[in-house]
Design a protein with these regions (language model features):
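Alpha-helical transmembrane segments and their immediate juxtamembrane cytosolic regions
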Residues: 1-193
């Protein structure tokens, strides 16, 4: 479901570049909003169930590097992030990888609270240039931290989506800020898991 929604969303961006406000484009982008929350949720679930964190992380990092080429080619953006803008310079897979790293950090008993806070800030800076920016990394952290409490997981997920929508509203596009909130459509799908 997430791959189909993502494909519809990305094809819409490629066929109709920019922030088009026609109903077909908006509808396809709204459908696409379910993708990221599903990915966030399953990164956290994968972390819980994996037998080898190292292999899981390496596969995700490799996929992030490979998908960067496809992402920059598809959207006609420079290969090197931050050369034109700070937003959406690489795929969401980069943020997924760093979200996974935050889950591992969160489980560490060797790190003090202030050290974890510094790491979260650093990871947010590292993942800022990706699709869904650092919102994806902190959403994964909160989804993983509240595993076992679906309502709390989804509440925090939507808090972070709302933060992303606010950034869109003030810095990118007001209509597409509202589109981000359609991530809530993923909640019934995730509840059925």
């Amino acid at each position: 479901i997430a791959i189909i929604a993502m494909t519809a969303d990305h094809l819409t961006w490629v066929i109709w570049p920019g922030y088009q406000t026609g109903w077909p484009q908006l509808a396809l982008h709204c459908v696409g909003r379910i993708t990221a929350p599903i990915m966030w949720f399953f990164i956290a679930e994968g972390y819980h169930y994996t037998h080898s964190f190292k292999k899981y992380a390496l596969r995700l990092l490799l996929f992030a590097v490979i998908s960067h080429f496809a992402y920059t080619f598809a959207f006609g953006i420079p290969f090197i992030p931050f050369t034109t803008t700070a937003f959406n310079q690489t795929s969401v897979i980069w943020s997924l990888f760093w979200g996974l790293m935050l889950l591992k950090m969160n489980d560490s008993h060797k790190l003090k609270g202030w050290q974890k806070a510094v790491i979260v800030v650093l990871v947010c800076l590292i993942s800022f240039c990706s699709d869904w920016s650092c919102i994806a990394t902190v959403a994964i952290l909160y989804i993983g931290a509240y595993r076992g409490s679906f309502k709390t997981q989804m509440t925090w997920m939507m808090v972070w989506v709302a933060v992303y929508a606010a950034v869109y509203f003030f810095f990118i596009d007001k209509i597409y800020a509202a589109v981000q909130l359609f991530a809530a459509l993923s909640i019934p799908l995730l509840k059925s898991y």
